[in-house]
Amino acid sequence: MAEAEKLFKINIVTPNGLIYSHRGSSVSMRAIDGDRQILYNHLPILTPLTIGEVRVQRGADVDHKVDHIAVSGGIIEFANNVATIIADNAERARNIDLSRAEAAKQRAEAHITEAKEKHDEQLLERAQIALRRAVNRIHVYGALHK
């Protein structure tokens, strides 16, 4: 008799509500100290996340679906086989509007140029964050549409 798949609950929540809720065999994300992967029965963890991609493997074998979600910072908590990501912003790859993401990238690049010309450090920092968010959304969209 085959061993039952070891799946756990993965939830992604933003200030706008629940964005994602499924069972999976692993969740991978970028934490502030590097890339992380959580599997069934992982030790409890609470760690901050950076702008990056969250990948959820929906089943134990490589042929199972992988969901891609763009997140813009937040935290992940894992305990009792439940992973909860509380993100500043999150968007599933299937919901990303590529033209809007590319337009946001162009706007951010223009703001970076403007901030450098004006020597405005605050504007530069905000524009660099906006650029990282836009590039992340484009990357996550591309991961789904390979």
Curated annotation (Swiss-Prot):
Pfam family membership, one: ATP-synt_DE_N
GO function terms (MF aspect): ATP binding; proton-transporting ATP synthase activity, rotational mechanism
Keyword Phosphoprotein: no
Keywords for this protein: ATP synthesis, Cell membrane, CF(1), Hydrogen ion transport, Ion transport, Membrane, Transport
Subcellular location: Cell membrane
Gene Ontology cellular-component annotations: plasma membrane; proton-transporting ATP synthase complex
Coiled coil location: none
Gene3D superfamilies from the UniProt entry: ATP synthase delta/epsilon subunit, C-terminal domain (1.20.5.440), F0F1 ATP synthase delta/epsilon subunit, N-terminal (2.60.15.10)
SUPFAM superfamilies cross-referenced by the UniProt entry: Epsilon subunit of F1F0-ATP synthase C-terminal domain (SSF46604), Epsilon subunit of F1F0-ATP synthase N-terminal domain (SSF51344)
Membrane topology: Peripheral membrane protein
The UniProt record lists the keyword Membrane: yes
Functional summary from the UniProt entry: Produces ATP from ADP in the presence of a proton gradient across the membrane.
Family recorded in the similarity comment: Belongs to the ATPase epsilon chain family.
Quaternary assembly: F-type ATPases have 2 components, CF(1) - the catalytic core - and CF(0) - the membrane proton channel. CF(1) has five subunits: alpha(3), beta(3), gamma(1), delta(1), epsilon(1). CF(0) has three main subunits: a, b and c.
PANTHER family: ATP SYNTHASE DELTA/EPSILON CHAIN, ATP SYNTHASE EPSILON CHAIN, CHLOROPLASTIC
Name of the protein described by the UniProt record: ATP synthase epsilon chain
Protein's organism: Lactobacillus delbrueckii subsp. bulgaricus (strain ATCC 11842 / DSM 20081 / BCRC 10696 / JCM 1002 / NBRC 13953 / NCIMB 11778 / NCTC 12712 / WDCM 00102 / Lb 14)
Gene assigned in the entry: atpC
